[in-house]
Structure formats: C-alpha cells, structure tokens
Amino acid sequence: MPLAAALLLMLSAVAASPAVAAEEALTAAHALLSAWHEDPARIDQARAQLEAAVTTDPTPETLTELSRVWFLTGDFRARTEAERVTAYERGMETGRRAVALAPRNDRAHLWLAINTGRTAEIRGVMRALALVSTIREESDTVLKLNPSNVEGLVLAGSLAADLPAMMGGDKAKAEGFFKRALEIDPRLTGGRMELARLYISAKRWPDAQRELQSIVDETAATDLPRWTVRDRPRARAMLTELRDRGRIPAAPAPAPGPSPSP
C-alpha cells in the first residue's frame, strides 16, 4: 500500500468507531512497516497510531502488533541503552496485555518472549535468570500453539544456541530448529543469520559461508526492511571477516573485461 494511502487510513481512523479504528490502525501500521527501511520514522508513525488505537479498543491483534513495533523501536530507533531498555520493557508490557486477552494467540506469546529476550540480553543472562525462565516458557508456548510459527522456531533455536548447557542450551537442537524454520520459509534471512552464527561458533566455516552468501544473494526477503538494514550488511561484513582471518577462501577476482578493439 502506498504511504499516502496509509496516512489516509491513519486520519480516517481518528473519526471511526473504536473497533473500526483499531482495524484501520492495524492496516495502516502494516503498510507503514512493510517498507520502513525507506524511512525509519515510519516505525514511530506506526507506533503512535497503534498506541492511539489500544487506548480506545485494546484488541489482541493491535496489542500484539504494538509489542512488535516496540521491539523494532528498541532495535532500530533507540539511540541509547536506556531508550532500548524502555522500548523492550514497553514491548513486554504490551505483550502481556495481548496474552491476557488472547492466551492462545501464538504471536502474542512470541513478541512477549522476544522483547523479554532483548531485555535479558542487555541485563546479562546471569542477572536476568527470572527473565530467562519467562522467555523459555513463552517460547515453548508459541510452538505448542503453532508448531509451524517460523519466528517461534528461530527463537527456540536462538535459546538453544546461546544458553549454557546447564540452562538448557543444546547446539544440535538449535540447528534443528533453525533448519525447520528455513524449510518453512527459506527467505527468512534473520533465521539464516542465526544458523550462520551457530556454524561459526562450531567452526563449520564452509557451512557458515554458504548461509551468509545466501543472505547476501537473497532477492525476495520475507522481511525486506530487516534484510536491507541489518541482515545483508551484516552478512557481507561477516564474510569479509572470515576471509580476512583465513577461515574461508578469498573472494574470486572479477573476470577481466573484453580486450579493447585495435
């Protein structure tokens, strides 16, 4: 949807009934977020619209989307660690509200878990043991409700990859979760990045190279904004670092052009 149309929906939602306004706010937010890489301020616009909607009609769908937008705010709009923590904590709070209204909504549990995970990352795992327990519970709930939730599979894989063994970490299980996610959605570059990170930690250099190159070469990423802003630049940088350290072969030199005519 063009940005102008999304803005019209935002304006019309102001005068609509609460239920209609919530639906229109959700539609407008989706339109804004589909191409936020073109203007990251669209994240802020979507958040403002959803905040207004949940004030009058806090539906599970709008609360869940707002929880996701708070995550995007923390990852891509916050300028300081304090702002990041605030964003993720707001995402947690909103996620809890969504779960309370719709306990069987797997996406509500997902974004509660993801925002909680980001908060734990900032605090440090050993200082956030209670949060880790919440993340694991919510992650398990996501997959119980929907075993094919792709982002839920990536989340489960990330937990298995990053937690120490004494807290449930398991590299083999992590690989299985990531591969299952990519079987369902091969163009989910965030999941492929997590798999590449796992391979690097295991010193499986050719496997890591394959996944990173696949990210760079992607032509139809599921999450285009994330691929544009984070995954592709990061994959390129990681490939360069692996080559510089001699972990993978140097990139082939470009083929010479045609000889000039005499």
Sequence positions of predicted segments:
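N-terminal leader/linker segments that initiate helical-solenoid repeat arrays
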Residues: 16-75
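TPR alpha-solenoid repeat register
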Residues: 62-63, 108, 152, 191, ...
